Amino acid sequence: MFRTLLTLTLLLVALPVGAKEAEVIVYGATPGGFCAAIAAAREGAQVILLEPTSHVGGLSTGGLSHCDSNQMRRESLTGLFEEWHRRIAKDYVDRGEPVPYDPKDKTAGIRWVFEPHVALRVTQAMLQEAGVTVVTDCQLTSVQMAGTRIAGLRTSQGAFTAKTYIDGTYEGDLMAGAGVSWVIGREGRADYGEALAGKRYPKPTMAIDGFDATGRPLPLVTGVDAGAEEAGDRNVMTFSFRLCLTRDPANLVPIPQPANYDSAKFELARRALKAGVRGIGFDLYPLPGKKLDGNNSIYGQVSLGLVGGSNTWHAADAAERARLWEAHKQYTLEFLHFLRTDPAVPAKTRADYASLGFCKDEFAATAHFPPALYVRESRRLHGLYILSQKDIIDSPAKDDPIAISSFPIDSHDCQRVALKGGGVVNEGTILPVRVPGTGVGYAYQVPYRAILPRPEQCGNLLVPVALGSTHVAMSSLRIEGAWMAIGQGAGVAAALSAKRGLNVQDLPYPELRTRLLAQGQTVELPTPPIRKAAPKAAEKPPATSPAGLILDDQVAELEGAWTPSTNFKPHIGKGYVHDEQRSDGKCRATFRFKVPTEDDYELGMAYSAHATRTTRLPITIAGGGVEHRLTVDQTQPLPAGESFRPLGQFRLRPGVDYTLTLSNEGTVGFVILDAFQLRPTGTTAPKPR
């Protein structure tokens, strides 16, 4: 339904004398692209890496600094991905700085975080050491075909020719220029039998009027009809920037006020805040150097993503993409200005956002604004194999694997619809689909066939980034770690094909597999992850004196989709769980306990305080016909040097079955469940006479 062919002119004339030659040309220096280039060069191929912008590394060096591998099977992410992270850690060691993470610790949930300029330095060093020639500001203008093979490329930096080509762009620009079939948008549920396809409405409808006084949809609304629920369409998930921010005065650059700011653009957000709608803002992840990674909130209602602004990006020429890039930047600066200044935003929230600035030591060439737009999804190859939901969840094994992917299926908004009967709803989000009882996605093998065009269309092109997949499958594949691994597979295949003069479809898989393993790539599926079942209540929770009773999340009865994590330290026990900001009332935890003596017990709570946490977590202690209710602001720090924050004192008696319950009903932000402490204060009851 969405298949389209040529967007660039196919040249059938010879390239000019002086065309730069290589055995392998990679177009697009994304993570998949630069790993493909390095892998090909390490196989002995002469490699040229062409990048249409001035920025090398895509999102991995352009602001996405909270590595999404925390939700993946890291033990299967080896090869260049692992080496890249080892070298990032070594960069900190060599400079005498604290190491932000240990790449040897593959435990899911642990944060692997870094600063953008460190990631760029490591990427450039690896490319240089491999002998890759890098050409930036090199925009593709046309493709020369000789039958079913690419003969050469014309670019803004001259002509280039190679034996084998790799499309490393997020957009699939080279495959489109070569006349290879591709798709855009979303499939219907019947197309590949995907339950997650079609329209998606996981977020609550905002109880606001989505129209202005004249009856027109408000700004930031994309339409009034999302289309048939079972059907696909040409929408792609929203794009945004990954901001690198700080509150450190020594490194803070003030965020500039946007030119031509129109407060009316955010009337939808203003109405939502007035109606008590949660999720107006964006996520912040801590980074080294007192920095923060700002991301579009997948659970949010209005966030950094310009919903609807991504749909024409794939077909735009260089000038139009520059205009769309500026439109996304303008929206980002305007949204930041709205959050920092608009009276509709609660004062505390305004102050929190107003304390943020750009980082003086990041992205100096672009005035400290990120150089790379987060193109989460664009064209997708329609080649020899199409990965779908079934390949991820039901049939993960393949005969010709080149990499293992395991990020949860996870899509951001595609539409924002004003309902004629009242209300505004975001459509298109697929909330993370993980293996139940774990914090990771399903592991599956990515087949070599998924990066191959049909041989009758092109015999010397590999497509590891815009690879063959449905929208649902791309919602899992679209992560830098997966693209790095798939790119490495493409690079090895390209070098082998070039050396032997083969079409990429004719390369014997056993030969490819041998060289992939030699480069440290993992192609075998990992053992299934250990699922964390909802634990039963302990008959007697661990007790210490004078610490009292410790109620760890491990002994709670959990209901709903809690996610285990060890991202933030310190924590009590093996880790903690959180609700992924669902705010749906379905995440509930119950502790059952008894106390040994009658006393006034001080209740303390362990959690990792952060600006992204909920400010109103409801907690109830009940037993013996008495009930105590309280709310906890998890943005508030714990007392210095303490593991628990005191919440209050409660009179408890022995022999009574008590319950302590909490839920994410009515919460805004992450709910963190680590542990509680019940510490006797020594105020015992007098003995009966």
Please name every model-derived segment.
Residues 15-19:
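Sec/Tat signal peptide C-region and signal peptidase I cleavage site
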Residues 33:
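N-terminal Rossmann-fold NAD(P) dinucleotide-binding loop
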Residues 120, 158, 162-164, 168-539:
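Flavin (FAD/FMN)-binding glycine-rich loop and adjacent Rossmann-like elements that form
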